[in-house]
Amino acid sequence: VNAVLLDDTLISCLEARLGELLRSERADTLTLEGRFEISRISAALSGRPGPAPRAILMTGLQGAGKTTLARAMEEAGFRRLCPDEEMFRRYGHYGRDFPRGEFLVREAPVLKDIALEVQQLLAAGHEVVVDHGFWTREERALWAATVLEAGGEPVLIYLPAPHEVRWDRIRKRNAKSLVDANSISFSEEDLLRHANRFEAPTADEPHLVYTGDPSAMLAAVDRTRKGNRNGRAS
């Protein structure tokens, strides 16, 4: 009887907290962490066991090491989804098979389809890494909400890298741009222009910082299960 009463009490507390969060959502005052809490409470009330599957969202410019890290996470069991590879599959080479000025227009439906695939994978219990840069705070918030709606846990990883390092990598990659979906050709002027548009995450966007070691980053991601949502992989 005591166990039943305890369960009933816990359910009542969860329902009350869920009501508070939903009122905050209607008032447009709900934080990103609040959205995650809604997802977790809803999962608990529905009887789904275990922690929420994670979706790794990366933020960084070209040449920062996103694909290297994403492939390491894929080897560790995450499902890797890459918009650039899907763009190459659908449309061919950027600047040869379609004009450079059409990239964003063509990318929009690709990102929409990948967002849907992310939700489907999370709903099935799979963990996901999105091999993409997510340059702006607004874009990151939208994708985090997409993850939360599917019952997943968004984990943001920031990949800072000096311009000189990125440009050296891009120069080497440019030679493969006609055959490699992950080697889109960019000039140094492109990189400098894009850097001015990039919004690095601040302390109010919980994130991990990648320092170039995939193994250390995987360990840091595992520690997010214990509630450490900010930090540097070391």
Please identify what each model-predicted range represents.
Residues 30, 105-154:
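Glycine-rich phosphate-binding loop used to anchor ATP phosphates in small-molecule kinases
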Residues 176-227:
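Small-molecule kinase domains that catalyze NTP-dependent phosphoryl transfer to phosphate-bearing small molecules
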Residues 150-170:
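Conserved phosphate-donor/acceptor-positioning beta-strand/loop module used by diverse small-molecule
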Residues 58:
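Hydrophobic anchor at the beta1->P-loop junction of P-loop NTPases
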